[in-house]
């Protein structure tokens, strides 16, 4: 039997060893056969993946999905800090009866210190509308609209920490670095208005939420699809040139830059990043006139300002949020595809957001007044103008709160096991309540749903299949809903 030459290195001997060669060859052929089998049975996600065709020179051009769309635009009202379901939408008479008693079965695992006893809802609930839906006295204006709403009472989250939970709600993942739902939507569908951003995030007058730009970031999608953040009182930074730069000089510089970019693009026609950069510069130039116009509310009638509460000098935070609500309506009116409207700011022991750990009733008296009338006026205004026919409105928060007070305090701890989202507008069946939490509002027990289900439903109403909308990143087929998510059919019209 011939032997291997002595001067072959050890790695070379391994490569020339016949047993090793045939063994690894057979293993590789088996892997190829398995791959073909999985493809033939549609068990590999890429087989069903759908990627939109995005023109490099017009990344925001309007596009259509694979399904028939019920909604054209989306408006998300996001209450940062975890607004309590027990003080808003989820009526629990048994919690009233058990007020002051220990938690049945012993205290649960909590986020911030030991748990105290069960605590009744801090507001009275009353039947509202023709449906008689029980809604808290904290929300009289929104409560009057319940016949137009669909309630999902059994949302669950993967985490009880604010930042990761905001990430999960907005991106489908608790980690940083994933695209927000608004970025996914605008990547897939573009926008109707080419003079305004396709995706706008409107921060609360008190500041930005804890997960910050993750809520409107593009993640690994092209950066052109990230949200643009501005409000009625704080327009886009650096929108205009410095005072020292004349209009003529600014126009000349812009023209020169455009000429150089276009010359470079002609030499490199396949450079999609350069094409996207040119498109972004052109949009920025158009925004110099369109954004000041859209944020100037002087053309709004006194009746409209009063309806929203935007003319109330006694409460500048509420008036500021009301003006943001008017801005949101104006953006939807102009065809902006996706609008995020934030109510509440960074973690502040509940003083600037809905994180009511210590003094829930005292703080919610403030937050409820800020949020209720302006948000209800926004929904009414959209409906009166016929905009709800093709606009989906979603009210949500990152998780719920516990049915007991924290020990030694008058507030509730974090609870990701059952909380409420409210939907209205395009494609939504009005007047329905989906799912139930247990008798004290501690956890979802019937028709349990997840944030993935909510996001899958939003995509479905826009004509997008959450199981197929896919972007390959680092060799992985990524989706907003990962490998999860079901459409919430019972709330759809």
Question: Which residues does each PLM region occupy?
Answer:
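Ligand-binding pockets and gating/stacking loops
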Residues: 1-493
């Amino acid at each position: 039997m011939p032997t291997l030459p002595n001067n072959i290195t050890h790695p070379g001997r391994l490569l020339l060893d016949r047993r090793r060669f045939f063994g690894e060859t057979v293993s590789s052929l088996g892997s190829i056969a398995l791959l073909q089998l999985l493809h033939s049975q549609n068990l590999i996600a890429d087989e069903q993946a759908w990627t939109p065709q995005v023109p490099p020179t017009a990344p925001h051009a309007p596009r259509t999905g694979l399904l028939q769309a019920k909604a054209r635009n989306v408006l998300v009202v996001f209450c940062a800090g975890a607004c309590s379901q027990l003080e808003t939408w989820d009526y629990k008479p048994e919690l009233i009866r058990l007020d002051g008693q220990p938690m049945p079965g012993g205290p649960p695992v909590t986020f911030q210190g030991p748990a105290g006893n069960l605590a009744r809802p801090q507001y009275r609930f009353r039947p509202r509308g023709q449906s008689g839906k029980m809604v808290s006295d904290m929300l009289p204006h929104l409560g009057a609209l319940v016949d137009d709403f669909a309630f999902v009472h059994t949302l669950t989250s993967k985490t009880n920490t604010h930042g990761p939970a905001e990430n999960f709600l907005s991106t489908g993942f608790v980690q940083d670095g994933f695209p927000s739902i608004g970025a996914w939507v605008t990547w897939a569908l573009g926008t109707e208005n080419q003079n305004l951003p396709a995706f706008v995030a409107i921060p609360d007058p008190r500041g930005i939420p804890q997960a910050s730009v993750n809520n409107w970031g593009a993640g690994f999608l092209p950066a052109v699809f990230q949200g643009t953040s501005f409000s009625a009182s704080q327009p886009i930074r650096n929108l205009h040139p410095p005072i020292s730069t004349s209009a003529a000089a600014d126009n000349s510089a812009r023209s020169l830059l455009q000429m150089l970019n276009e010359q470079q693009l002609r030499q490199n026609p396949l450079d999609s990043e350069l094409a996207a950069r040119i498109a972004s510069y052109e949009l920025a130039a158009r925004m110099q006139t369109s954004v000041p116009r859209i944020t100037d509310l002087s053309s709004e009638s006194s009746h409209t300002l009063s309806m929203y509460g935007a003319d109330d000098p006694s409460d500048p935070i509420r008036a500021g949020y009301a003006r943001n609500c008017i801005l949101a309506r104006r953006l939807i009116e102009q065809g902006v595809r996706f609008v995020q409207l934030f109510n509440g700011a960074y973690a502040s022991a509940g003083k600037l957001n809905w994180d009511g750990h210590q003094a829930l009733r005292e703080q919610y008296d403030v937050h409820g007044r800020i949020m209720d009338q302006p948000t209800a006026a926004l929904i009414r205004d959209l409906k009166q103008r016929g905009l709800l026919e093709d606009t989906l409105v979603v009210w949500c928060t990152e998780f719920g709160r516990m049915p007991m007070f924290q020990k030694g305090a008058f507030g509730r701890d974090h609870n990701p096991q059952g909380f409420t989202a409210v939907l209205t507008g395009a494609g939504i069946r009005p007047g329905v309540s989906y799912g139930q939490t247990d008798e004290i509002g501690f956890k979802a027990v019937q028709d349990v749903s997840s944030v993935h289900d909510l996001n899958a439903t939003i995509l479905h109403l826009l004509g997008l299949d959450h199981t197929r909308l896919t972007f390959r990143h680092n060799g992985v087929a990524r989706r907003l809903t990962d490998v999860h998510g079901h459409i919430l059919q019972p709330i759809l019209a």
